[in-house]
Design a protein with these regions (language model features):
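Glycine-rich, acidic loop regions that bind phosphate or pyrophosphate groups
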Residues: 1-66
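Thiamine diphosphate
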Residues: 2-3, 111-189
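Short coil/turn connectors at secondary-structure junctions
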Residues: 16-19, 35-36, 97-100, 120-123, ...
Length: 278
């Protein structure tokens, strides 16, 4: 969506073997951060309709097979015991058999949801990508549930994101929507804290949220069912109960504040220098 540091890394090394075509509604963004080979200014929805009509439809079978082979050879793993972000996402996949619509907020939980849930069907992962829109997920989950009343919708949120738009739990209750809100509660703004931990000598600023907010009571105050999970066993039980419920459920999942998302690229580096934390 934007040629920012999160997308480019080292701008001088970005996609050196590719032809770059930039679409943007704002002409001022063209060639702003990188030089492109061609540009189209206008509404992306209309532009893509025209391009799809002109281009041959490619299946990219060889490339997809190559990526699937990499996933087998180099699977994502984690060794941390107890309740962790990756475990939460994997358990959601196990109990839903990959048939849920997964929505995310923004942060570490967003990355874990992309990495550890095995998506079987198109249009079942709703995320704002790199836009950084904390608070997006709950409203998007409500919309997804209204549009798909026969599907299970689960919003995976960090505790920081839940605070941004948690009042919409009351909307879900009022509309009798059986969505599930899974709060990955590490008591910090995890993505920013990870950067502070790795690149700023653990000088933590404005990222600690350990102020005793009780998300279970907040959920109950708005008419939803609330559970708190501190172990794998209690999360498994809470999720099973939530999936059987016919009304909104909030599960407050307490995890450690030092869990990291891997791999990652350091600020100003390029994708070839991504590191895994090992």
């Amino acid at each position: 969506v934007r040629f920012s540091d999160r997308v480019l890394g080292n701008a001088k090394k970005f996609a050196k073997q590719a032809k770059i075509l930039q679409f943007d509604v704002d002409a001022a963004e063209i060639n702003k951060n990188i030089r492109v080979d061609a540009a189209v200014i206008g509404d992306l929805k209309e532009i893509l309709k025209r391009i799809n009509a002109e281009l041959p439809q490619l299946g990219h079978e060889a490339w997809i097979a190559h990526i699937l082979d990499y996933k087998v050879k180099y699977p994502l793993t984690y060794q941390e015991p107890g309740l962790t972000g990756p475990y939460l996402v994997e358990e959601i996949y196990r109990q839903t058999d990959g048939d849920a619509i997964i929505v995310t907020e923004v942060g570490q939980h967003q990355m874990w949801a992309a990495q550890y849930y095995k998506y079987k069907n198109p249009r079942t992962f709703l995320s704002s990508g790199g836009l950084g829109t904390m608070g997006y997920g709950l409203g998007a989950a409500i919309g997804a549930q209204v549009a798909n009343p026969g599907k299970q919708v689960i919003n995976i949120a960090g505790d920081g994101c839940f605070r941004m738009n948690m009042n919409e739990i009351a909307t879900a209750v009022r509309q009798k929507l059986p969505l599930i809100e899974v709060i990955v509660n590490n008591h910090v703004l995890g993505m920013v804290r990870q950067w502070q931990d790795l690149f700023y000598e653990k000088r933590y600023s404005a990222t600690v949220l350990d102020d005793g907010v009780d998300y279970v009571k907040l959920a109950e105050a708005m008419g939803a069912t609330g559970y708190r999970a501190t172990t794998r066993e209690t999360f498994n039980e809470a999720l099973k109960a939530a999936l059987a419920a016919k009304t909104p459920v909030v599960i407050d999942c307490v995890i450690g504040c030092d869990d990291k998302v891997w791999p990652m690229v350091a600020p100003g580096a390029d994708i070839s220098t991504a590191f895994t934390g090992e």
